[in-house]
Amino acid sequence: LVAVTKLAQITSGYYIHPVIFTDVKNSMTIAQDEIFGPVLCVITYKDIDDAVAIANDVRYGLNAGVYGPKQEAIAVAHRIQSGNVYINDSPRDTAAPFGGYKESGIGREGGVYGMIEFTQQKALFDTCKE
């Protein structure tokens, strides 16, 4: 545990204040579950292949981020099994599809793919002669 900020006391629910966890192993629950909140887990890796293996060794795949020289980061991003991979930033473009891989969900929201998810198609056949 590296950093935690003092915030108002929360008395019910499952919440954690903004925090950075170090010395995290990929087998730990905190590394394997989807955590929605201001939480960062630091997992060390030997090389890029090891980093990609760690990133892909989860049941989920909603968001990922890669930081480094642009072309190298893009090459790594292509190898990560995630619905969204941010490269050297974490913007959100509402015109882009948003959704996960694996147990992070099927389907997309946003962009053309998101509209298709919420569109019900119908085929009409008219063989009557007037």
What kind of region is each of these model predictions?
Residues 4-10:
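Short, solvent-exposed loop/turn elements at beta->coil junctions and helix N-caps
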Residues 1-4, 86:
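A short linear hydrophobic-aromatic micro-motif
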